[in-house]
Regions:
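Zymogen propeptides/activation segments of proteases
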Residues: 1-187, 194-367
Length: 367
């Protein structure tokens, strides 16, 4: 115990919660602190940008219910249509007088709920402790603009920058704005950039930059299709990245068929260019297609060769082991090496997965 001049102890540095679980639904219905002076998550609800009712956790400060989840380290703020370059940030998270936010903060509810889903995936599936694997909080800022892109209030983007998520918005024609915090795939994509930044830190140029983008696309699509089924059946997956966000209303990219968005799906079509840091958003589609192949390849019985949760873990372990200038071939070798280690002790399964990886990449010309 710390206090009255005593030194720190492990109880000061490690969060200890206990909880009660509903025996019928298996849902956590009540959290409580297992140590003194620890913030306890409070159950809340609210309407999000998609007009859906969402359940999430926050905390109570005085008479206010804040979008700060102390258990998952997810915090959500309103930037009030200010420039993301301004040094002054909101002093307090989005709050409400009741635990039911209703439709009073739809952008904030979407950001908070979706960041929680991504956080849960990182923690439960990848076994990663936050973005930096050291418990970094996921801080989201809604209602942002970037003055270098125009005076606003429209800012058609969402970005991981300065260790935070910044969400723009677009006018929907009825005097209101649709926040980019509604797009789970975009959020997962951007937060994966945070993992890349704090692990392999792939150089954002040429093939290493294309890998940087591809890993974000891979996890964006997997996480977007993970909930609520954890994962949902593969037959119903949406393989598009940013559906509806491209000019003309189409997707930004499509992992299942990159040619739908005019992008390459094979090394024969690799785009040699100095534009976009060596075509990072274009050539990433070749590696995206390889990942799609691996996610969907089946055995003779018509079953998935590698379940999506295992594919996600293999790619995560690969990402954290790459060097900064890694190219597509380096990634393939690292992925096979990770699979060897992961399936060590089961040689037949090891060989089966290695063959699946080799075939998935060979089909797009990566060797």
């Amino acid at each position: 115990h710390r206090g009255h001049g005593l030194a720190r102890s492990p109880r000061d540095d490690f969060l200890l919660y206990d909880y009660l679980v509903d025996a019928h639904s298996a849902e956590v219905i009540y959290y409580f602190s297992a140590q003194p002076l620890l913030d306890v998550p409070t159950s809340m609800t609210g309407i999000d940008e998609l007009a859906a009712s969402r359940d999430f956790h926050g905390r109570v400060i005085g008479t206010k219910f804040e979008l700060v989840d102390p258990l998952r380290a997810v915090e959500t703020y309103d930037h009030e249509f200010k420039d993301i370059m301004l040094p002054d940030l909101p002093s307090a998270a989005i709050s409400h007088s009741q635990p039911d936010f209703g439709n009073s903060h739809t952008a904030g509810v979407s950001a908070h709920f979706n960041a929680t889903l991504v956080s849960n995936f990182f923690n439960n599936v990848l076994k990663r402790n936050g973005i930096d694997d050291k418990g970094m909080a996921i801080i989201s800022m809604v209602h942002c603009i970037y003055l270098k892109d125009g005076a606003g209030p429209d800012w058609r983007n969402a970005v991981w920058w300065n260790d935070r998520m910044w969400y723009g918005q677009v006018s929907n024609g009825s005097g209101e704005f649709d926040s980019y915090s509604r797009y789970l795939d975009v959020i997962a994509h951007e937060l994966t950039h945070g993992i890349t930044q704090s692990s392999s830190d792939l150089i954002y140029k040429d093939q290493s930059g294309a890998l940087n983008e591809s890993f974000s696309d891979i996890f964006g699509v997997i996480i977007n299709n993970w909930y609520p089924g954890e994962p949902n059946l593969m037959a119903g997956w949406n393989w598009e990245i940013g559906p509806g966000l491209a000019r003309g209303g189409g997707p930004l990219r499509d992992m299942s068929d990159p040619t739908k968005t005019g992008d390459p799906d094979h090394m024969d079509k690799f785009w040699q260019t100095s534009i976009d840091n060596g075509g990072v958003h274009t050539n990433s589609n070749i590696h995206n297609k390889a990942a799609y192949n691996l996610l969907t390849i089946e055995n003779d019985a018509g079953e998935l060769m590698v379940p999506p949760g295992v594919v996600a873990l293999l790619y995560y372990l690969t990402l954290t082991r790459l060097t900064r200038r890694a190219d597509f071939s380096d990634c393939l070798r690292a992925l096979k090496s990770v699979a060897n280690t992961y399936f060590m002790g089961n040689s037949s399964r090891q060989q089966e997965v290695r063959r699946a990886i080799g075939q998935a990449y060979q089909d797009v010309g990566i060797t």
